From Swiss-Prot:
One of its GO terms (cellular component) is nucleus. This is F-box/kelch-repeat protein At5g60570. PANTHER family: F-BOX DOMAIN-CONTAINING PROTEIN, GALACTOSE OXIDASE/KELCH REPEAT PROTEIN-RELATED. The lineage of its organism: Eukaryota, Viridiplantae, Streptophyta, Embryophyta, Tracheophyta. InterPro entries: F-box-like_dom_sf, F-box/Kelch-repeat, F-box_dom, Kelch-typ_b-propeller, Kelch_1. Residues 48-95 form the F-box domain. It comes from the Eukaryota. Keywords: Kelch repeat, Repeat. Kelch repeats lie at residues 88-142, 144-190, 191-238, 240-286, 288-336.
Length: 393
């Protein structure tokens, strides 16, 4: 009898341990998915995410918390910190179609800032652990999925640093097959394409590469029809485009190039960007909003829209008052959902700062005037925007 009671107790303990294991934190699974033992995602019946709600419902609620608040959310307790760091909420947001736009910009060597247009909130990113050469050299930036890629130059070579919104830290990542600067770039979901630019020896490139954020690897693509530097890139209607730039120190490129991801071929579009680039000028400032292409003509401070059918540009209206740019350098012109953002310097009675202006193309233009709205102001950072990227995820 004693042996039987002891055996029953062992079975009870084993069952209890099994139940406890099935109720443990399994944050690497999506809602509704099961692990190898058939356990659904849960954070424990006795340790629920939000008291009074089943875990799946609670996780759906937390998925709507703005991503700019994740650092605060992760400080609530160890459970929330583990949930945030697992990346489960990031995946769940994608499933639910939740998109929040975050702006990353740098205005001085002190470091990067993050701005939430939705919350009108500025935040300081952790300091990038790069060397001083990279910190002070010219850089280019690109947002891919939930990563910010920063391209620059160290003492003897090009380098790429990556900031992960998920881990909230910087890491040095794999370089391109053909390292370069002054290139065209654009991103679509979890991929990005870079094309053209200049290598370490000053050679102007026609090569292009594709970056996959899921693997962190670069893949060579077919060459463009012509080499070019100081050019701009963007995705529109699911295809990648390159416009502007120079094929030699004195020759501007006026035709555009379109890359089809399915056929893996480039197509020339004659006269797509007839403006003549100069060596001292910035690359074309372009954005795509709702698959419509816009450019900021910094010589006239006018916003223009591209007519895909006529292959022509039409004037929409004027920029808001701002500090004059230096041949287009120091300005940022970026898309943000259905809005178009301009980051420019202003001087006022309280000093210098950066003003974020927005315009919705759907509102149109009235007598050449665009309805600009101020989204935010960052004071005491100078009037020059060195780099800027917008992340939507």
């Amino acid at each position: 009898m004693a042996a039987e009671e002891h055996s029953n107790k062992r079975r009870e303990v084993s069952a209890s341990a099994s139940a406890s294991a099935s109720a443990s934190v399994v944050v690497n699974l999506r809602v509704g998915e099961e692990d190898n033992d058939g356990h659904r995602l849960r954070l424990g019946s006795s340790d629920s995410v939000l008291p009074g709600l089943i875990d799946d419902v609670a996780l759906n609620c937390l998925a709507w918390v703005p991503r700019s608040d994740y650092p605060s959310l992760s400080c609530v307790n160890k459970k929330y910190n583990k949930l945030i760091n697992s990346g489960h909420l990031f995946a769940l947001r994608k499933e639910l179609g939740i998109v929040e736009y975050l702006v990353f910009m740098v205005c001085d060597p002190r470091g990067w800032l993050m701005f939430s247009p939705m919350k009108k909130k500025w935040m300081v990113l952790p300091k990038m652990p790069c060397d001083e050469c990279f910190n002070h050299a010219d850089k280019e930036s690109l947002a891919v999925d939930d990563e910010l890629l920063v391209f620059g130059r160290e003492l003897f070579q090009f380098a790429i640093w990556k900031y992960s919104l998920r881990s909230r830290c910087w890491v040095k990542c794999e370089g391109m097959h053909r390292p370069r600067c002054l290139f065209a770039s654009g991103s679509l979901g979890g991929i990005a394409i870079v094309a053209g630019g200049t290598d370490m020896n000053g050679n102007i490139l026609a090569s292009a590469e594709l970056y996959d954020s899921s693997s962190g690897r670069w893949e060579m693509l077919p060459n463009m029809h012509s080499p070019r530097r100081l050019c701009s890139g963007f995705f529109m209607d699911g295809k990648f485009y390159v416009i502007g730039g120079m094929s030699s120190p004195n020759v501007s490129v006026t035709f555009g190039e379109e890359f089809d991801l399915e056929t893996r071929k480039w197509r020339k579009i004659e006269g797509m960007y007839p403006n003549v680039n100069r060596a001292a000028q910035a690359p074309p400032l372009v954005v795509v909003v709702n698959n419509e292409l816009f450019t900021l003509e910094y010589s006239t401070n006018m916003v223009k829209k591209y007519d895909k059918v006529k292959n022509k540009w039409e004037v929409m209206g004027r920029l808001p008052p701002m500090v004059d740019s230096s041949n287009g350098w120091g300005l940022a012109f970026k898309p943000c959902g259905d809005q178009l953002l301009v980051f420019c310097g202003q001087r006022g009675p309280h000093g210098e700062g950066i003003v974020v202006n927005s315009w919705c193309p759907k509102s149109g233009a009235k007598d050449g005037n665009l309805d600009w709205k101020v989204l935010g102001v960052k004071e005491n950072v100078g009037v020059f925007v060195y780099n800027c990227a917008v992340m939507g995820c």
